[in-house]
Amino acid sequence: MQLTELSIQSQNPFVRDYINGKKEIEPFFDYGLSNESWSVRLDDLSSRTYDRDALADYLLDYHRKFQSATMNETIERLRDPKSVVVVGGQQAGLLTGPLYTIHKIVSILLLAKQKEQELNVPVIPVFWVAGEDHDLEEINHVYISDGGKVKKHKLPQSHWKKSQAAKTALDAEKAEKWLDGIFASFEETEYTNDLLGHLRRCLRQSLSFTDFFEFLVADMFEQDGLILLNSGDPGIRNLEARFFRQLLDKNDELTDSVKRQQELMKQLGYTPIIEGAAQHANIFYERDGERFLIEKENGAFFIKELHLQWSEAELCDLICQNPEAFSNNVVTRPLMQEYLLPTLAFIAGPGEINYWGELKGAFQVMGYKMPPVVPRLQVTFLERHIEKKLDERGIELRESIEKGARAKKEQYFQDKVPSGFTDSVKQAKEKIENIHSAVRAEALEIDGSLGPLLEKNAGFIQDQLQFLEKTVIRRIEEKENYILRDFDKIQTSIKPLDAPQERIWNIVYYLNKYGPDFLEKYKDLPYSFQNMHQVVKL
């Protein structure tokens, strides 16, 4: 493996200006990306207290299923009052989901190791598994290449309820068939049987989406001491209950703070992405396995679908009695994270940078400062045969990452279609139509009822010319097929579905092709947090 870096600007203006350190962004964050921010943040954390022992005890109990001494040792370090964490999170995607999940975990591990050396305090890597998330349509599939086409390979399920990923059961039989379908799309290698066997074993010991995700991630990263915090686990709610009540107490202030921040964002020409904050209490309530967002109006909290209504005091009592029924939304999840963890830094994807910028006031309402928000590594894997095709087809690497190869393919093909031929067909259509129009006019003078028949005849003649043109173009496509497929292969590998590679493809393809040490080699590359696009040549 070889690492190279490219300067590729984000398409999101807010993210781009944040990374470039524009002054307009300062009102949205408490810390910048400069080196001075780290010692300031460390000092700020030293003035706060955390229930470290309760958190460590809970995590040790939760991590028993992984049977990892390394993970347990890392958890014990949380008891040290000087310890801090680097945290990032993602939904519990099948087979770990899109590549950006792996890139985010590597970013967490890398920054934690780097800051521990620089700051001389224990810095612990934590991955926040969004097990409380109920948007299963986002995690119930992976993409595969089928006959050169990118296709969504969805796990069959009779009915997708609005249940948390941590509580959504996996049908083992259906999931194994689904897994076999993925491997059927792969080229069989010397690693295939062992990898498939390992994934099946992880699947069989998993009861839910979150289980399957965590067993895979733990296996990949447990030697790095990565800690997993499943936000959908009922056991974490006892630690969160007190803060849920604080969120209710300051609910109106939270709502107002988000609205003000969003208005400021709009005034500066940026686009907020959090929706409906004014009507929501920003807390979910679970009943019969489904999540419902609590709304508020005139001091009352309610869920229309369930015909439920509470006063603030009644809802606080319910949280005390049954904390497992409550969970966070996009606004309160970052605040809960700040409450539970001594967070040195939050590793964020582009979308998270945008919506965290809407929450600075919310952090202040709860008495916190927003932690430094560090952009995760953005990575493209460049396979050797794809790199060769880029060179052969005259496509720059940067261009392929930013735009793909579709436009180059179209240009190449158009250059192969003789301009004289298309012009000749166009002229023939016009001349024949002019002649036929005159003939139609004479025929109509003889018999006015012939109109429909004459129009049909004219259309038939034009269709024959169209057929001729398409046939010639198809022959050119067949002749140039080998080269045209090269453009398609570049597009599929680097810019599938016109999206960044990291948003579509899954790590299992690379593990199957390059073997179990692929991940170790990838983790050990000399990355730097200089906001450059990382290209890993395979």
From Swiss-Prot:
Its EC number is 6.-.-.-. GO terms for molecular function: ligase activity. Residues 454-482 form a coiled coil. Keywords: Coiled coil, Ligase. It comes from the Bacteria. It holds the Pfam family Rossmann-like_BshC. Belongs to the BshC family. Involved in bacillithiol (BSH) biosynthesis. May catalyze the last step of the pathway, the addition of cysteine to glucosamine malate (GlcN-Mal) to generate BSH. This is Putative cysteine ligase BshC.
